[in-house]
């Protein structure tokens, strides 16, 4: 019987249990009760399964929230699974750039830096850039903005992000009737001289997480929509709770954003 190895990855503080599902039966890891237990035991924000590639993609990505819900994209999860593919020795078929399929469609992933030190050292990380889906439509509502960057996000600008009660206010907005029936993730953003400082309440986790890749992407696009200045057009630096990330994009007509990229660190934390 093949023993499934569990890997814990962290993408800028967003932690995941990751499984190599290319060989053996991993169907048990899709069960809600199993996902809940693993995410609780390993203190992660989700579980991912890397699946086999085919003639079109190098691998597939399945993402599940700690409550077992799936069907959405996770940006930091996408960066971590690209690092995981590199760790496993998977070679991209297309010019050094990985192609992978997630629930929201096709993505690319590129390794910009590889670990150069031991686990826990300042250089033990990958720097990964992934291409997100094109985004069209930003809807002003409830004192903020709503959009979909692979999953649903509400973005609200605040004067001091450190003073926000993210769990209380985030929960109220997450379940607001305007977002019924499935709700939304909620991001609070402070525009600072060094970039956008972001805190996120994630549905499925039902609390604040240390980072959210699709949320950071949403915040950058909303910042552009709202006219927030940036040193480089179509590029924003964003501070999650533990790390800096960047979002680059090409704005177009009718609030359509293409060539949307999320870049940041990914680390292999432990193996079980």
Predicted regions and their residues:
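Internal active-site segments that recognize and position negatively charged phosphoryl groups
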Residues: 138, 142-163
